UniProtKB/Swiss-Prot annotation:
It comes from Aeromonas salmonicida. It holds the Pfam family HTH_1. One of its GO terms (molecular function) is DNA-binding transcription factor activity. InterPro entries: ArgP, ArgP_gammaproteobact, LTTR, LysR_subst-bd, Tscrpt_reg_HTH_LysR, WH-like_DNA-bd_sf, WH_DNA-bd_sf. The lineage of its organism: Bacteria, Pseudomonadati, Pseudomonadota, Gammaproteobacteria, Aeromonadales. This is HTH-type transcriptional regulator ArgP.
Length: 299
């Protein structure tokens, strides 16, 4: 294989970041035809497409590998520059991390707060379901991910963080209105629940396993916000699975009730990141591992 031309990889990265050839050209201060030519040269070098010209633009599997490699090298270069010339003003280091909404709403930001106060960091948080966050690392969009999958990707390493415990919860008024006779199948079939999105099978699998309810057999809101789950439960709008870590105070004060004390959902969480980490990225991993293990239940 010919040596990689990082000027061409820079063009590929710019196109994917901007999702537009014209804006990518403006970012690199070159013409649109020049950036198209660089992408073409790179595709000719590997004799296969690297971009899927769709909306949004997507990288092919090979394109994802090249982007992941380029972004790792770029991050290492930025951190090395800071180590070589620590007294010179350094541009903020952009750190992309894929994280699930429930971790973001509970332990994740407190874990990173000291580093954000001490270092010039630009966080780019890619929030997704814990089943899918690892895809962002695979596609080269993030250097690390909080995921429920324990198997590392090629070129990555993984550490167990702990387990997140979910409770089926609702407000006392909601329970009195909808479940006067308990969580019966008839009551559950007409009572609104909440899921993260249409691909979130956490609530679906929980209800099927413990109450025999099939998908689509009951009303269910979709809300892509962990904080909104809590708000909807507190306001008596729905019942839902919420991390115990997120609602300890509400449970202690009786604002929310555990609807099914004998049935809880336990999800393991892992921290995945590039093997080639150093400097600030290594500090980020150390903070997430130590604070994740402190906040979550041992696996």
């Amino acid at each position: 294989m010919k040596a990689l031309d990082y000027k061409l990889l820079l063009a590929l990265d710019a196109v994917m970041q901007e999702q537009n050839f014209e804006r990518a050209a403006q970012r690199l201060h070159i013409t649109q035809s020049a950036i198209s030519q660089r992408i073409k040269q790179l595709e000719q070098q590997f004799a296969e497409p690297l971009l899927i010209r769709s909306q949004p633009l997507q990288a092919t599997p090979l394109g994802q590998k090249l982007l992941a490699h380029y972004r790792q090298v770029r991050q290492l270069e930025l951190e090395l520059a800071g180590e070589i010339a620590p007294d010179e003003p350094q541009a903020p280091i952009r750190v992309s991390i894929a994280v699930n909404a429930d971790s973001l709403a509970t332990w994740f930001l407190p874990a990173l707060a000291p580093l954000l106060e001490q270092h010039p960091i630009e966080l780019n948080l890619l929030v997704d379901d814990e089943c899918r966050t690892l895809d962002r690392v695979r596609e080269g969009q993030a250097f690390g991910a909080v995921s429920l999958h324990g198997q590392p990707l090629a070129g990555c390493c993984v550490d167990e963080l702990g387990e997140m415990r979910y409770l089926l919860t609702a407000s006392p008024a909601f329970v009195a209105r909808h479940f006067p006779a308990g969580l019966t199948p008839a009551a559950l079939a007409k009572t609104p629940a909440v899921a993260f999105d249409q691909r979130d099978d956490m609530h679906v699998s929980f209800m099927a396993r413990h109450f025999g309810l099939e998908p689509g057999g009951y009303p269910c809101h979709t809300v892509r916000s962990s904080e909104a789950f809590v708000a909807m439960a507190e306001q008596g709008l729905a019942y839902c699975l919420i991390p115990e870590l997120q609602i300890r105070q509400q449970l202690a004060q009786g604002i929310l009730l555990d609807l099914s004390p004998s049935h809880h959902l336990i999800e393991p969480l892992y921290w995945h990141r590039w093997v080639l980490e150093r400097g600030l990225h290594k500090q980020i991993s150390q903070r997430l591992i130590s604070e994740g293990r402190r906040a979550l239940q041992p696996g």
